[in-house]
């Protein structure tokens, strides 16, 4: 089993781990930054959860940057894209339509070594997706059916419920996500509260060993130790408006230098540098999404001028 992927999954749990401590906690920082308990961080996140659970809409600007080092074996046609810096930006609005189903309008752009492409995706009702991506799909809008996005899917309550259920399952299996963080701090500045923390990789791997149904072999433990030493950065932060408690920004940084023994298993990958930054705005401000006229049903044979057939 390739354990090199485990830290990437663990970073995704960083935000969830912030709010998994027990107790209500209290207090905070009136300026600068100070260390806080998991319970205190959890109380800040609870206030944010309460503020977003009935949210009807929000704007967002998400930027993902990835740098992969090494000569990736077997990358094929994607080699040029993977051998240099890659960035993806998603910018738009998402919320609830009048009927209670989800709606969204998102512009996206992917930049990579040797090229780029951009497009737009929208849905006025959560039932039909409309996509415009000239480089890959040709001119005009294309439509394809979506499974209906209900009101929970459009807001935060469904996500919060799923996260809570996932944390409960981990705890029942013997893991404690509340201990996955270190260097936890809370700062207040310019009308924002910011929670920051590093992922405790050693504790994450210890919990992985605990909950593993098939057990951890000596070889697995060696790999996990190598991965733990290879990780240079696993940091996350969440910012909220101090008055409304609505999220304003989220950032995740992850960096890893693979040792030679892991590079072979990772198809020649030597390093990973990832940065995700999401800014939130326009909370509960309605927006209009209209189905584009003249959209044609999506046909994969039209991809890349017929190469998708």
Give, region by region, the residue ranges found by the protein language model.
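Subset-of-secretome marker
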Residues: 3, 19-309
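C-terminal motif of bacterial Sec signal peptides marking the signal peptidase cleavage site
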Residues: 14-17
């Amino acid at each position: 089993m390739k354990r090199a992927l485990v830290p990437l999954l663990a970073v995704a749990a960083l935000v969830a781990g912030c709010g998994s401590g027990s107790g209500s906690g209290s207090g905070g920082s009136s300026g600068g930054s100070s260390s806080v308990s998991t319970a205190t961080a959890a109380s800040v996140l609870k206030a944010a959860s309460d503020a977003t659970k009935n949210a009807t809409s929000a704007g967002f600007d998400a930027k993902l940057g990835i740098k992969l080092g090494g000569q990736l074996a077997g990358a094929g046609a994607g080699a040029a894209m993977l051998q240099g810096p890659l960035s993806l930006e998603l910018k738009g609005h998402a919320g609830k339509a009048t009927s209670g189903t989800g709606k969204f309008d998102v512009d996206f752009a992917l930049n990579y070594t040797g090229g780029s492409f951009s497009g737009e995706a929208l849905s006025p009702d959560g039932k039909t997706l409309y996509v415009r991506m000239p480089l890959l799909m040709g001119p005009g809008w294309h439509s394809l059916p979506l499974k209906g996005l209900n009101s929970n899917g459009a807001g935060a309550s469904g996500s919060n419920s799923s996260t809570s259920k996932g944390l409960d399952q981990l705890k029942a299996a013997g893991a404690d996500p509340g201990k996955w963080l270190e260097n936890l701090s809370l700062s207040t500045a310019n009308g924002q509260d910011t929670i920051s923390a590093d992922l405790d990789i050693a504790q994450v791997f210890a919990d992985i060993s605990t909950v593993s149904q098939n057990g951890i072999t000596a070889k697995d433990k060696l790999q996990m130790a190598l991965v733990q030493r290879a990780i240079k950065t696993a940091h996350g932060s969440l910012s909220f408006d101090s008055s409304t408690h609505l999220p304003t920004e989220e950032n995740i940084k992850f960096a890893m230098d693979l040792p030679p023994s892991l590079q072979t298993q990772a198809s020649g990958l030597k390093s990973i540098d990832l940065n995700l930054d999401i800014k939130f705005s326009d909370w509960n401000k309605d927006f209009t999404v209209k189905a584009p006229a003249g959209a044609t049903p999506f046909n994969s044979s039209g991809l890349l001028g017929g190469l998708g057939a």
